[in-house]
Amino acid sequence: MAFKQLLAALSVALTLQVTQAAPNLDKRVACPDGVHTASNAACCAWFPVLDDIQQNLFHGGQCGAEAHEALRMVFHDSIAISPKLQSQGKFGGGGADGSIITFSSIETTYHPNIGLDEVVAIQKPFIAKHGVTRGDFIAFAGAVGVSNCPGAPQMQFFLGRPEATQAAPDGLVPEPFHTIDQVLARMLDAGGFDEIETVWLLSAHSIAAANDVDPTISGLPFDSTPGQFDSQFFVETQLRGTAFPGKTGIQGTVMSPLKGEMRLQTDHLFARDSRTACEWQSFVNNQTKLQEDFQFIFTALSTLGHDMNAMTDCSEVIPAPKPVNFGPSFFPAGKTHADIEQACASTPFPTLITAPGPSASVARIPPPPSPN
């Protein structure tokens, strides 16, 4: 599995960092800006990119719609790779190669990429200004965006994605109306990800919202704390659904437990499938596990299609994540353990407190402004 290969590569890299720690400190290079130093001169170019996007893309380092969409871009660009197609003599996509921007006139017309044309338009000027590759920028912006969310792990960034040469084929990005079997088959083909690692990837929905799933309403979060990288998503997806936040009958959605909150059909199914339910539940009130697993799987995702041994580790450019500023997981006001649809057969659902007060609607997240 690609997952196992990455683990081995990271283990070797960590060993080398430990054994060579003192020499590396002496070999740091001074960056041209006169402010920063780096372990590799190639990383210096990314400090100005960081300053620029933190101020002008993420509005001073906020965990808002732009951060959510930057993370979405990483998934939709990276997962578009198929060794299965390659084995049939067809082009299977380049993975994390920036093709969703390079060939945006093609790939943003694919159904699962609806709405990403606006994100592409927002990100393109930054790429042109700094002269970096599209694939590297997507991965970098995604890592920085996540780091702006309290509770996020220390994100990693590896440099060295060449420009895409072809548009990725259609049909490689999972959709919310797909079955569990369809999603798992796609994830296994793309990166050797199994059902457990797929759950790790879905942790991204802790800081996500839907802008285009329901065309009648945008900015619908998938949990009640979209500005925090926490485990609340894994609590609320196990609550019994009671109503749709907007229009009923939207393909790929099911009833959610809270007003203003959207629940994707795939999230609902993963929380209840016997292959994934226990891993899903394991994140509840386990911030350390959430951070460690997402840090790892983001790196695996954002390097799909590339040899990590040929890439440069520039993780030092990614800022330290904002610290946890929230308490343990909880039941939203008006909800209790009785509202949980228990699916993990081997482990009881954790004991949680219920938030005080009357039940309230989850606030919408304003979408990113349209580019000029």
UniProtKB/Swiss-Prot annotation:
Pfam families: peroxidase, Peroxidase_ext. Its EC number is 1.11.1.14. Pathway: Secondary metabolite metabolism; lignin degradation. Residues 1-21 form the signal peptide. It comes from the Eukaryota. Ca(2+) 2 binds at S206, D223, T225, Q228, D230. This is Ligninase H2. It comes from Phanerodontia chrysosporium (White-rot fungus).
